[in-house]
């Protein structure tokens, strides 16, 4: 327990919270060619590579991911959720924060059903997460 004098000399400092999605906290001023502090919930980007990655130790799969150059000129790896996708190089995508626990270096998710990304076909439950439209009812 510090004394009052110790606290007067050096007050308590609050912990600095590190962002889990740092690329969303930067903007880019193309006129001045400088990075700016402009946080946003999602960012637009262009796919530079689309491929698969194997997860960490106890799991086994081929997880789909895309390397995306964002509108603020930062390149990130983003996970493509859902079964099947239509992404290829030069596709324009929208990314949001959210890491994939068993893929190292993947801190972002691609938003399905936005821009060039199609929704998941035949998805009945949790449709809003995968950009799937409500199916037509049969009479």
Curated annotation (Swiss-Prot):
Which residues are recorded with the post-translational modification 3-methylthioaspartic acid? 102
Write the protein's name: Small ribosomal subunit protein uS12
Assembly and oligomerization: Part of the 30S ribosomal subunit. Contacts proteins S8 and S17. May interact with IF1 in the 30S initiation complex.
Q: Name one Pfam family in it.
A: Ribosom_S12_S23
Q: Where is this region: Disordered?
A: 1-44
Source superkingdom = Bacteria
Q: Does the keyword rRNA-binding belong to this entry?
A: yes
Instruction: Tell me the organism.
Output: Macrococcus caseolyticus (strain JCSC5402)
Q: What InterPro entries does this protein's entry cite? A: NA-bd_OB-fold, Ribosomal_uS12, Ribosomal_uS12_bac
Q: List, in alphabetical order, the GO biological process terms annotated in this UniProt record.
A: translation
**Gene3D superfamilies per the UniProt record, alphabetical:** Nucleic acid-binding proteins
Record's function text: With S4 and S5 plays an important role in translational accuracy.
Q: Which UniProt keywords apply?
A: Methylation, Ribonucleoprotein, Ribosomal protein, RNA-binding, rRNA-binding, tRNA-binding
Q: Where is the composition biased (Basic residues)?
A: 9-18
GO MF entries: rRNA binding; structural constituent of ribosome; tRNA binding
This entry carries the following GO cellular component terms, namely: small ribosomal subunit
* Entry's family note: Belongs to the universal ribosomal protein uS12 family.
Question: Disulfide connectivity?
Answer: none
């Amino acid at each position: 327990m510090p004394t009052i004098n110790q606290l007067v000399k050096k007050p308590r400092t609050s912990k600095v919270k590190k962002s889990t999605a740092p690329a969303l906290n930067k903007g880019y001023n193309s006129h001045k060619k400088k990075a700016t502090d402009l946080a946003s919930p999602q960012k637009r980007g262009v796919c530079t590579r689309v491929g698969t990655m194997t997860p960490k130790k106890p799991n086994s799969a081929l997880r789909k991911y895309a390397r995306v150059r964002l509108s603020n000129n930062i390149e990130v790896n983003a996970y493509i959720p859902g079964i099947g996708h239509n992404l290829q190089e030069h596709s324009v995508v929208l990314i949001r924060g959210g890491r994939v626990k068993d893929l190292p270096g993947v801190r972002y998710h691609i938003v399905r059903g936005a821009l060039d990304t199609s929704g998941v076909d035949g998805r009945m439950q949790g449709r809003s997460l995968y950009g799937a439209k409500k199916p037509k009812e049969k009479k």
